[in-house]
């Protein structure tokens, strides 16, 4: 599956799981994550990959790590999509941060 196809299905899943969420596709400059998700008073950054073994661009690890310290951020690919969505759902429900390990 191509990354753009995976991203499209992920966006559909996010809209279904988080009704009313604002989902923005970010410019792919400087390694910024692909998606910003705003839901109620929470936010998340998600970097889509076609597979677990897909390469990372410069700065992607930095931005995911920094954003995860502030809120929720993760690399997401077909092999971990369910786990990431479950962790994101938990993070959006709680008043404290829920972190998901980027290297699973």
Task: Label each PLM-derived region with a short phrase.
Residues 1-104:
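Catalytic phosphate/metal-binding cores of nucleic-acid and nucleotide-processing enzymes, i.e., regions
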């Amino acid at each position: 599956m191509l990354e753009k196809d995976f991203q499209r299905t992920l966006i559909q899943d996010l809209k279904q799981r988080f009704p009313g969420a604002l989902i923005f596709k970010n410019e792919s400059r400087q390694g910024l994550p692909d998606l910003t998700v705003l839901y109620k008073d929470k936010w998340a950054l998600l970097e889509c990959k076609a597979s677990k073994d897909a390469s990372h661009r410069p700065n992607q690890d930095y931005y995911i790590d920094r954003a995860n310290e502030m809120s929720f951020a993760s690399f997401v690919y077909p092999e971990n999509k369910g786990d990431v969505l479950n962790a994101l759902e938990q993070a959006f429900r709680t008043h404290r941060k829920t972190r998901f390990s980027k290297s699973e």
